[in-house]
A protein has these predicted regions:
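Signal-transducing coiled-coil linker helices
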Residues: 195-200
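A composition/biophysics-driven feature that prefers long, compositionally simple stretches
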Residues: 1-188
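Short regulatory/linker helices and ligand/cofactor-binding micro-motifs at input modules
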Residues: 189-194
């Protein structure tokens, strides 16, 4: 998929947001398997839908203006030896067409400033309790900065984003057809070569 594809999704979704609003989504987290290993990572589907970014510990902000911001991990050559390639801030900005990128370690410091003075904050409420608590904390800090402004409204965006994902683009439909073709050919090949008494 062309990376512009994800940027266009963000721009298209921003049109469904009220003016002076922001959408915040968080990535999946790594899940510890035992002391020093984790389960294979799978990105949150909604986060991937809008970013194409497949690293953990990330947060996306989409402004109603269409501006998009990504918080992610700094590039770390030592960590890459164990966990694989990392885009880092500049790499993520260039490859995934974000307007700005920041170190995820600065999220608690910068997000209240970024959402300060906005009318609405959208997210997928109830999906991740820990992230919901972060949202409330960031909103509280932002509201305290704007003593003469109305407080930011927290609104669930699940239905709007879900309806967007239901409608497939021509590119998505072509990929789905290709996937079905590969799966069908694999099943046909297995059936042609299956013999009595064979096991998996």
């Amino acid at each position: 998929i062309n990376i512009n594809f994800f940027k266009n999704r963000r721009l298209n979704l921003a049109k469904d947001m009220e003016d002076n609003s922001v959408l915040l989504l968080n990535s999946s987290s790594t899940i510890l398997r035992n002391n020093d290993t984790t389960f294979p990572f799978r990105q949150d589907s909604n986060f991937y839908y809008l970013t194409g970014f497949e690293e953990p510990d990330s947060i996306m902000l989409l402004m109603s203006s269409g501006e998009s911001i990504l918080f992610c991990r700094e590039k770390n050559p030592d960590l890459e030896k164990w966990d694989g390639f990392m885009f880092g801030l500049e790499g993520a900005k260039q490859e995934f067409h974000f307007d700005k990128t920041f170190d995820i370690k600065l999220a608690d410091e910068l997000i209240p400033t970024l959402i300060q003075g906005l009318s609405n904050l959208y997210s997928l409420i109830g999906k991740d309790t820990l992230f919901d608590n972060k949202l409330i904390s960031w909103m509280s800090k932002a509201n305290s900065m704007e003593r003469h402004q109305e407080n930011i409204n927290l609104k669930d965006f699940s239905n709007t984003l879900g309806m967007k994902r239901l409608i497939k683009s021509n590119e998505e439909i072509e990929l789905m057809r290709k996937s079905c073709e590969i799966a069908a050919n694999a099943h046909i090949n297995v059936m042609k070569n299956a013999k009595s008494g064979m096991t998996e």
